[in-house]
């Protein structure tokens, strides 16, 4: 349904530039249309490919670009979006189970460039859960935050169990 309105919070009136991470870390919400120059998109590494996995967080490149560049902001609708019932937000649990290596990779990137201490902890717990689902026994050694990863292992194990239970319940509905 097209409302012609900006989704989520608009940018503050006095804001002329920000990083995507900075916007969300300061309380921003909703989908935002990101428009980058091709040379900037091409300046960061390509999306990695993991065997038998078809998902990687699109924000991977945005997180890397945030380290070098800021975005100009515009409080206008530049693209109408129609959300699908079976769209990405409705199938995330399935994605967690089908693409754990991709999600673990994304969480490692987030742990390297944390937006806040709270977000770092959340990403670390998710990294552990994704690594457990992927059956990666070397996840602590591969972590950019080894000590925090050790501490995040118990809640990460619980989160991986939650994902499995949630996935099973979604399968029963069909």
Model-based region annotation:
Residues 3-90:
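Conserved nucleotide-sugar donor-binding catalytic segment
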Residues 37, 58-61, 99, 103, ...:
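Alpha-helical structural motif
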Residues 63-64, 86-88, 94, 129-132, ...:
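Charge-rich, low-complexity amphipathic helices
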Residues 79-84, 91-117:
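Catalytic core of nucleotide-sugar-dependent glycosyltransferases
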Residues 108-111, 129, 133:
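Alpha-helical repeat scaffolds in large eukaryotic proteins
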Residues 118-119, 150:
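Short, solvent-exposed coil/turn segments at beta-strand boundaries
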Residues 120-130:
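Structural register within alpha-helical repeat arrays
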Residues 131-174:
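Membrane-interface aromatic/basic loop that binds lipid-linked glycans or pyrophosphate carriers
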């Amino acid at each position: 349904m097209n409302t012609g309105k900006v989704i989520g919070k608009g940018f503050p009136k006095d804001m002329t530039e920000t990083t995507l991470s900075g916007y969300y870390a300061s309380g921003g919400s909703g989908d935002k249309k990101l428009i980058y120059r091709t040379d900037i998109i091409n300046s960061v590494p390509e999306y990695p490919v993991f065997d038998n996995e078809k998902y990687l967080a699109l924000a991977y490149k945005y997180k890397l670009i945030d380290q070098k560049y800021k975005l100009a902001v515009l409080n206008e609708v530049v693209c109408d979006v129609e959300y699908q019932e079976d769209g990405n937000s409705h199938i995330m649990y399935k994605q967690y189970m089908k693409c754990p290596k991709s999600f673990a990779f994304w969480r490692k990137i987030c742990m390297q460039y944390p937006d806040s201490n709270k977000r770092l902890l959340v990403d670390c717990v998710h990294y552990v859960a994704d690594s457990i689902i992927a059956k990666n026994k070397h996840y602590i050694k591969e972590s950019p935050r080894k000590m925090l990863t050790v501490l995040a292992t118990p809640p990460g194990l619980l989160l991986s169990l939650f994902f499995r239970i949630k996935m099973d319940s979604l399968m029963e509905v069909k």
